[in-house]
Amino acid sequence: MDTLNSYNKKDLRAYYKKLRCSLTDEQARKMDQEIMIQFRKIPIQGKGLKAALIYIPISHTREVDTKQCIQYLQEEIKPGLQVAFPKTNFTTLDMDAILPEAATTFTETKHRLTEPDGGQKIAPGAIDVVLLPLLVFDQKGNRVGYGKGFYDRLLAKCRPDVLRIGLSYLPPITQIEDVTEFDIPLDYCATPDRLYDFTNQ
């Protein structure tokens, strides 16, 4: 494994992509279960959630699976919770939250993202909670994604009280060097070992 010499986003992105892809299927499945234990500790009971935006994991980059999170939210936290999924536009670098309908199918794009074909677009202001993909996060709740800024742009349009949750197989680093004013931090991040709470920072 290469040595990490700096903590800027570009180097972190390259390093943690390789590190995460080195995980075996068995390791990932085990950690998915452990992350779910921590996810359940997030104080979202009684919040009156109506709509969530949840990413569909990219298998070849070893993103944390979200199926159990969806099941937990819809069955134990808020029966009938609307779960929307991202649909990206690589020309405008914008992203919409799409609520699938009965006839909605999901296809893999040329960027290897699984996205809904059709469905109902949900206004950013109607979203109560967002599960964000990430490669690495730091002890202040900042995250490094894939570099296009899709989620930060969407979050900027959401209500200030939207709940921002990350899922990570790996623990945080001390600090991401090149955080900007456009980077929107997490409220919580669930890892296999613990739940990180950034709401009081």
Predicted ranges, named:
Residues 67-71, 146-151:
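Charged helix-capping and loop-helix junction motifs
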Residues 56, 87, 99, 115, ...:
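Short, structured patches in soluble enzyme cores that scaffold and shape functional sites
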Residues 107, 125, 144-148:
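Short, amphipathic alpha-helical segments
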Residues 92, 130-134:
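A short beta-strand-loop-alpha-helix capping motif that often carries His-Thr
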Residues 2-110, 114-122:
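N-terminal active-site beta-alpha-beta segment that forms phosphate/nucleotide-binding
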Residues 37-40, 148, 189:
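Structured catalytic/translocation cores of nucleotide/phosphate-coupled proteins
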